[in-house]
Amino acid sequence: MLKKFKSWYKNIFGSRREVVREETMDVKNHRVAIRDVTYFVAKALFTDIPEMIEIERAVYAGQAPWDSTAFANELRREKDRLYLVIRKNDKLLAFIGSTFDERTRDAHITNIAVLPEYQGKGLGRFLLGIMIKKAQKLNYKTVSLEVRVSNKNAQRLYRDLQFEQTGIKRGYYFGDHEDAVDMELFLNENEDEAEDGVEPETREQN
């Protein structure tokens, strides 16, 4: 009897969980207003990869930490990966990537990059807000990421969103072996963070 109940429970609530997950990972192309400027938001496509690599090079002094194969492998994993891009006038300005781990209930930000000339305009905050909200919808415990020790501007943004430093990874980054700061957002304590940025025509003021 107990086995039958467990099987019934798993079928009913497991399938419901899967529906919620599929809905959460789905993103419709839409326009958003961030600080009164209109942008276009969409899921990343394979055709976006060359521009994503160019943004990496612009951000990381000519280096591209991820190559086209790495990005393509990520985009194929639609069940547990989500990559979004922001465009204006058909130019890719920013992107973000995240893994969604059902076992640990953690959304891990794998990539976030904004063209230097568009930094400080709220694009990074907006993209993080989307991922945070999706993790909340999935009832996850945390959103996590790594950031260079030297990247104080990014650290300020993450702390403003209530991320906390949880550790240091020594020699983490390829090439220069710079240390990384581990940071986590504990969602049950910060459910109201990053409400902006998940619906069409959303206004991001910070």
Feature-to-residue mapping (PLM):
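Conserved N-terminal entry element of GNAT/NAT acetyltransferase domains
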Residues: 1-46, 189-196, 200-205
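C-terminal "cap" of GNAT-fold acetyltransferases
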Residues: 148-151, 171-206
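Conserved catalytic-core motifs of GNAT/GCN5-like acyltransferases
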Residues: 26, 146, 159, 164-179
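Conserved hydrophobic beta-strand within the GNAT/NAT acetyltransferase core sheet
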Residues: 109, 143-147
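Conserved glycine-rich acetyl-CoA-binding loop
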Residues: 115-129, 138, 149-156, 160-161
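Solvent-exposed beta-strand sheet faces enriched in polar/charged residues
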Residues: 99-101, 146, 166, 184
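Acetyl-CoA-dependent GNAT
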Residues: 5, 34, 43, 47, ...
